[in-house]
């Protein structure tokens, strides 16, 4: 076995800082939790006679006059009326929402059945306020937002206690295995085993229970959101395990059942922690080939030339503009290097794996224009299920501008055409100060592309054996190409 190194700190850092981990932010302020359920008296008037919110035709019940219940009632009606009902709600935004041939906010954009469901579910939530904790209300809002089937539409949930275990989903042509890649040191012998069940609930049922709360557009992003330790990793969050009945009560231990490839079973009884102590955990990633992908986590983007292989490897960790060294600077430096070493390069590898996106205007269009000026034999763009948002836009832009380029890896987390351009600060529920993420623009990078995922031209599935032995399956497959 090749040399291994412990990457617990990186795993935890990614969990807390990754662009996808915004969903784990602590709420700025929340109403106090109830001590005892409040007895609710239904309004004496028929519901149809109650006025609509802000003069709209939609009817939301008004049951509470003061206190926590009134605050949540106002937030729920504000959320429903402004997030889906009031089609003029984004007129104050600096970047109006527009789809290619129609307004994102037109009456035809949402299906009438979906609008009606929002109205009914909002009224149901208002009635249930006294019987729900604040966390339960927020997860119910997230469940409602998830009905939009938009990977960018979601709520900033409160930070949940985490179980000291981390997973990576390994996709195959005929399915998927979820492998444990981070564990307490005392259970190190169970590293790389398959997840079988959580508290006796089989993996398939875990997915079924968590799926209604997930904002996703394809199966790759769904599985990544639930299991991947570089993303949300909901399967290790106590709050949602309690919400979905996988865990009976907060604070109780949960049993993660794992199975080795030779059939040995492991039952790990774990308790969630408000913050994980990396000194008590072990997590291994291969050091040899994988060191290329994770070689420099301190910079947003960087490249390395391999003259002996006639190859340039470009790694983009995330799309955050570094004003001291822009994408344009990066492209120009590569152009100079190529011209100084014969004027052409056989392979250009652009690695967008584990890239959750970032700033919409990070300058990647300028970079691609420079890329087109380099004499390249073949451009390969590496993607996986955690390639999302602007990572998708970059991959699609390269394909559009350099049609002979090839996508390599596993199905990506989004299709090339999707709603994005987040405006996080513009939709805040007034009393609890919780942000709901709202897309503000439609990205149609490849207008003729059909399908719910960016599908690689060359499908290459990483294997657990390669992972354990330090082999980057996808990168090595590209290196082996003529």
Q: Over which residues does each language-model region extend?
A:
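Sec-dependent N-terminal signal peptides of Gram-positive bacterial secreted proteins and lipoproteins
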Residues: 4-23
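Flexible, low-complexity junctional segments that flank or bridge functional domains
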Residues: 21-347, 378
């Amino acid at each position: 076995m090749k040399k291994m190194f412990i990457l617990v700190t990186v795993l935890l850092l990614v969990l807390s800082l990754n662009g996808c981990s915004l969903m784990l932010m602590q709420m700025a302020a929340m109403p106090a939790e109830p001590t005892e359920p409040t007895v609710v008296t239904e309004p004496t008037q028929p519901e149809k006679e109650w006025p609509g919110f802000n003069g709209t035709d939609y009817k939301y019940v008004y049951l509470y006059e003061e206190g926590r219940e009134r605050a949540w009632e106002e937030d729920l009606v504000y959320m429903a009326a402004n997030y889906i009902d009031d089609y003029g709600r984004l007129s104050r935004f600096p970047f109006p929402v527009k789809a290619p041939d129609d307004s994102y906010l037109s009456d035809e954009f949402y299906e009438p059945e979906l609008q009606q469901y929002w109205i009914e579910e909002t009224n149901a939530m208002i009635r249930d306020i006294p019987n729900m904790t604040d966390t339960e209300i927020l997860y119910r809002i997230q469940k409602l937002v998830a009905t939009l089937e938009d990977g960018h539409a979601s709520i900033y949930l409160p930070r949940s206690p985490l179980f000291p275990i981390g997973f990576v989903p390994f996709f195959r042509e005929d399915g998927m295995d979820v492998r444990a890649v981070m564990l307490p040191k005392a259970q190190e012998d169970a590293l790389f085993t398959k997840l079988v069940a959580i508290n006796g609930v089989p993996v398939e049922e875990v997915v079924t229970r968590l799926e209604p709360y997930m904002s996703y557009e394809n199966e790759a992003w769904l599985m990544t959101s639930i299991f991947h330790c570089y993303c949300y990793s909901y399967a290790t969050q106590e709050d949602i395990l309690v919400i979905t009945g996988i865990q009976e009560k907060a604070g109780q231990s949960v049993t993660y059942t794992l199975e080795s490839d030779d059939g040995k079973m492991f039952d790990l009884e774990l308790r969630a922690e408000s913050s994980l102590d990396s000194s008590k955990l072990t997590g291994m990633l291969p050091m040899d080939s994988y060191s290329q992908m994770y070689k420099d986590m301190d910079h947003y983007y960087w490249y390395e030339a391999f003259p002996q292989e006639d190859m340039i490897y470009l790694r983009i960790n995330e799309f955050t503009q570094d004003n001291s060294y822009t994408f344009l600077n990066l492209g120009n430096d590569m152009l100079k290097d190529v011209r100084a070493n014969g004027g052409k390069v056989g392979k250009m590898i652009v690695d967008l794996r584990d890239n959750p996106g970032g700033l919409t205007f990070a300058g990647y269009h300028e970079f691609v224009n420079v890329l087109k000026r380099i004499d390249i034999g073949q451009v390969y763009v590496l993607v996986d299920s955690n390639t999302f948002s602007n990572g998708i836009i970059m991959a699609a832009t390269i394909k559009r501008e350099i049609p002979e380029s090839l996508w390599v890896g596993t199905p990506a987390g989004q299709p090339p055409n999707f709603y994005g351009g987040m405006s996080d600060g513009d939709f805040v529920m007034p009393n609890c100060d919780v942000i709901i993420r709202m897309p503000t623009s439609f990205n149609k990078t490849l207008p003729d592309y059909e399908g719910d995922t960016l599908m690689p031209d060359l499908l290459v599935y990483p294997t657990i054996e390669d992972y354990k032995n330090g082999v980057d399956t996808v990168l090595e497959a590209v290196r082996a190409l003529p």
